[in-house]
């Protein structure tokens, strides 16, 4: 393995060290990492998506994000970016390039399809406050009261909204609890341990 100082930058070093199957290693500036995990803020559009053959299916839209303010919701599909069809972007392996610069104010036009049809919306990246707990509620399932909560991140500020949601679900008569961690990217082990100990 070449010495670290033989690469022009950290991104080049990571690219050289990664194997093709590695989808998880990445480099992030310390400022955005600290903002996300310690300050409860993020910079971006505020979407989590699944890549399909010709679209990005939105799995989660942060409630206080630019994307949510522009009307995007879970289940919507982005079918074009800046007028370029997603199928073409994906075929060229150019998704990261299509999303462009990551700084605040960088804007893109998205063609978004949902049950209401197709529309074009322009969204600028910006800082927004994270919602750690999304969509808590109690549902009647098989004669039991089942609480549901989507817990987004084990960030430092996530414990209070988690406890508030848990108290609310119990007050509404929840007998069972579903904790949705599908979009949870991890975080601080101490927070995860405290969340787990509450169950």
Regions of interest found by a model, annotated:
Residues 1-177, 183-185, 190-198:
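Flexible, low-complexity junctional segments that flank or bridge functional domains
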């Amino acid at each position: 393995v070449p010495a670290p100082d033989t690469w022009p930058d950290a991104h080049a070093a990571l690219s050289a060290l990664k194997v093709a199957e590695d989808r998880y290693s990445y480099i992030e500036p310390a400022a955005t990492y600290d903002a996300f995990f310690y300050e409860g803020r993020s910079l971006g559009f505020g979407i989590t998506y699944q890549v399909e053959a010709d679209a990005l299916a939105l799995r989660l839209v942060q409630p206080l994000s630019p994307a949510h303010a522009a009307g995007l919701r879970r289940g919507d599909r982005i079918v074009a970016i800046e007028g370029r069809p997603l199928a073409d972007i994906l075929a060229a392996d150019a998704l990261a390039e299509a999303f462009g610069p990551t700084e605040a104010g960088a804007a893109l036009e998205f063609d978004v399809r949902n049950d209401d049809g197709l529309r074009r919306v322009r969204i600028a990246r910006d800082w927004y406050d994270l919602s750690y707990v999304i969509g808590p509620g109690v549902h009647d399932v098989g004669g039991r009261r089942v609480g549901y909560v989507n817990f987004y991140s084990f960030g430092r500020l996530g414990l209070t909204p988690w406890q508030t949601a848990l108290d609310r679900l119990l007050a509404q008569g929840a007998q069972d609890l579903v904790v949705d961690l599908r979009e949870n990217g991890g975080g601080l082990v101490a927070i995860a341990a405290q969340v787990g100990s509450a169950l």
